[in-house]
Design a protein with these regions (language model features):
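Conserved short beta-strand elements that form part of the metal-binding/catalytic scaffold
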Residues: 26-60, 114-118
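N-terminal beta-strand motif that seeds the catalytic metal site of vicinal oxygen chelate
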Residues: 1-16, 65, 120
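Conserved active-site alpha-helix within GNAT-family acetyltransferase domains
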Residues: 12-22, 104, 113
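Short, conserved charged micro-motifs
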Residues: 14-16, 72-77
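Short glycine-enriched loop/turn motifs at secondary-structure junctions
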Residues: 1, 58-62, 98
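Short hydrophobic/aromatic beta-strand element in the GNAT-like acyltransferase core
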Residues: 6, 45, 66, 103-104
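Vicinal oxygen chelate
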Residues: 79-120
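Conserved acetyl-CoA-binding loop of GNAT-fold acetyltransferases
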Residues: 21-28, 87-88
């Protein structure tokens, strides 16, 4: 159902490096101030961009982007990879809802909150 989500960033090159390495993905579209990152354009993508209005990007209060991990082990791996790539911890991996939801939370180098999760 989701085609892509857009994240405002301060440094486009650094953001492209962070997200391509985090997801083992590629820059599929690059138009200067915006890049779309993913496996293919017919699957959900992450777009990183410098805001069109030229002002500094800001993090929305209460906004978060969640990415499926596929398993608890993969959630842990994604969390560790994000931290190694410069993200900060916003909630270590763990069971959030007993027997239902396992998640880990980070903030990317621009402060955007990300969640890696598995329904298990």
């Amino acid at each position: 159902m989701i085609g892509y989500t857009t994240i405002g960033v301060k440094n486009l090159d650094a953001a492209k490096t962070f997200y391509t390495k985090l997801f083992d993905a590629e820059v599929l579209v690059d138009v200067g101030r915006l890049a779309m990152i993913g496996q293919t354009t017919d699957q959900p993508m992450v777009a990183v961009c410098e805001p069109f209005n030229g002002e500094a990007p800001s993090v929305g209060n209460g906004n978060m982007i969640a990415f499926p991990g596929g398993s608890k082990e993969n959630v842990d791996k994604m969390y560790e990879k994000a931290i190694a790539l410069g993200a900060s911890c916003d909630g270590e991996p763990g069971q959030r809802i007993e027997d239902v939801f396992y998640g880990a939370y980070v903030k990317d180098p621009d402060g955007n909150k990300l969640c890696f999760f598995d329904f298990s």
